[in-house]
Amino acid sequence: MFDISFTELIVIGIVALVVIGPERLPAVARTAGYFLGRARRYIEQVKRDLNEEMELDSLRKLRDSMHETVDSFQNSVHSEINKIQETADTRPAAVPEKESHAVESGGKTEPENTEAAASSTPKEPRQSGS
């Protein structure tokens, strides 16, 4: 904490011995040690609190950026869904070309390829041998 060498501590001790006196020096040293220990613990606690706050702040920033990402993703999904719904609502139902010719001529249309028409007729289902 402080950069005090051993010789400087000796000088401080001698000055304290002369100023305070030998009777009160042990009690003053104990009190000074007690307050010095409390100050160290207080400083360590403040350091821990600051580190926790910095970590919490970085976690809050991360959480906020994640919320922004999720919100933007949801907005893009909703906009795409709305576009699809608008497209589905505005497009008319497609009418097959053969049916549209039949409607225009007012009659039935004959299949162009009779062989294809014959092959498209369903066959009779097989009956099981009972």
From Swiss-Prot:
Its main location: membrane. It is found in: Cell inner membrane. InterPro entries: TatA/B/E, TatB. Residues 80-89, 96-111 have a biased composition (Basic and acidic residues). It is a single-pass membrane protein. It comes from the Bacteria. GO terms for molecular function: protein transmembrane transporter activity. The Tat system comprises two distinct complexes: a TatABC complex, containing multiple copies of TatA, TatB and TatC subunits, and a separate TatA complex, containing only TatA subunits. Substrates initially bind to the TatABC complex, which probably triggers association of the separate TatA complex to form the active translocon. Part of the twin-arginine translocation (Tat) system that transports large folded proteins containing a characteristic twin-arginine motif in their signal peptide across membranes. Together with TatC, TatB is part of a receptor directly interacting with Tat signal peptides. TatB may form an oligomeric binding site that transiently accommodates folded Tat precursor proteins before their translocation. This is Sec-independent protein translocase protein TatB. The gene is tatB.
